[in-house]
Amino acid sequence: IILLLKEYQVNVPIHRVSKLKEQGYDITGTKSDLIVKMCRAVKAKNFIFGTLGRTYMNKKTFDDNNINYYFQNFEHPKYKQLHGEFVSNMSSIDLLFNHGKDSIEILGKSLGDTK
């Protein structure tokens, strides 16, 4: 993950739950409760769910904790791969190896609306 963040020039702090627990934060629970606890521990005001987040997230839990939520509507981009026909749903490492610095532009075009 750190390599991908560096290559895609994404500069964000990285927090590990194990470290938060070592610091005394209560990072337990399931689904929305767990996510909200993680957000509160790192003072996050926004959370982006994957496409399936709508199926399990509890809006009230986020609203009660003043955490904004968004849903990713990622549409997998088609791009030229080195060998054979395009194979969908590969790791972003595949995209990086096939397109190098152009990968971020390819990904950016496929993010879709997050509302």
Predicted regions: what they are:
Residues 1-115:
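Residues lining hydrophobic/aromatic ligand-binding pockets adjacent to catalytic sites
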